[in-house]
Amino acid sequence: MSRACELTGKSVQYGNNVSHANNKTRRRFLPNLCNVTLMSETLGQSYRLRVSANALRSVEHRGGLDAFLVKSDDKELSQRARLLKRQIAKKQAEAAVAA
């Protein structure tokens, strides 16, 4: 399992610890990842995703998983999230035709 957010693509970054004496040692900055279950209102199902705390805030801010995925760029999403986005778009298109 990679240390990357499935919705925003945030992943491990590398840098230095810098001491008071200005000694530098390499370190990793890990993203704050959480295993969460998010509900898709369009599909009527819940999905387990590994997302960063920042992405979770963004999902709530945009009004849910469906709205977040529709507005997000494909290159940031994981393969699972892209598949989910396509399913949501297909279901919304079917609902628009039926209405």
Swiss-Prot record:
<dbReference type="InterPro" id="IPR037147">
    <property type="entry name" value="Ribosomal_bL28_sf"/>
</dbReference>
<dbReference type="InterPro" id="IPR001383">
    <property type="entry name" value="Ribosomal_bL28_bact-type"/>
</dbReference>
<keyword id="KW-0687">Ribonucleoprotein</keyword>
<dbReference type="InterPro" id="IPR034704">
    <property type="entry name" value="Ribosomal_bL28/bL31-like_sf"/>
</dbReference>
<dbReference type="GO" id="GO:0006412">
    <property type="term" value="P:translation"/>
</dbReference>
<keyword id="KW-0689">Ribosomal protein</keyword>
<dbReference type="Pfam" id="PF00830">
    <property type="entry name" value="Ribosomal_L28"/>
</dbReference>
<dbReference type="GO" id="GO:0003735">
    <property type="term" value="F:structural constituent of ribosome"/>
</dbReference>
<dbReference type="InterPro" id="IPR026569">
    <property type="entry name" value="Ribosomal_bL28"/>
</dbReference>
<protein>
    <recommendedName>
        <fullName>Large ribosomal subunit protein bL28</fullName>
    </recommendedName>
</protein>
<dbReference type="GO" id="GO:0022625">
    <property type="term" value="C:cytosolic large ribosomal subunit"/>
</dbReference>
<comment type="similarity">
    <text>Belongs to the bacterial ribosomal protein bL28 family.</text>
</comment>
